[in-house]
Amino acid sequence: SAINGWGSWWLSSEGVWLYGGWHNVMNGIAGLLNIFCMTGWWAVYASKDGKDMIWPDMIWVYIIVYDIWNFAYTYNCLPTHSWFCGVALLLAPTIAALLWNKGGWIMNRANTLCMWCMFAQVFPLFQETFADGSTKYAWATITTQYADGTMNGIAVGNAVNADPTAMTVVSALALITNAIALIYIVRKSIKTKTNPYKGEIFTDFKYYKDAAARAVIK
């Protein structure tokens, strides 16, 4: 959408009007940084009960910056669905991982994402917002990207009814937080003389210790 609709509206293959700009670029860079915030690749284990995949070094530092980045992505690229595939779908695995399923975030994320995608394709009107701003269900919402709450006057190549302010703010937040997290990881890896990808960085954190206690580590 950044290329096809830079500073103007563009109709995606899903029939959603997108408004491209620097917010897409910032979020794209944040996504690349987020990849490098994943540490401890060689330390992923099965849980002792055999029900979970445990990644002890994927602690709240990564989980939070991932959530911020992914919400910005959905807000930019799936604006009429961002409450569901953004906020709600991100909170589900995060709450579980922070409270009772420590170390199991990535498996929770995969499972909830799969369930949501299957549900949304079977019941698409659950999340649909129509061009006039109306919805089948009251909880479906249209974002402030559409300035007057509708898609009135929108056409390919124009900027009528566009307000990218919120998209710019969340994308900038995603970029800043992921940059801070990566800088912290690099500094910690230098200090501990540890390869952050073959080794583990957050072994001194309580979250790591709680997660590792659930895993079969040989």
Segments predicted by a language model, with ranges:
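Generic multipass alpha-helical transmembrane bundles of integral membrane proteins
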Residues: 1-103
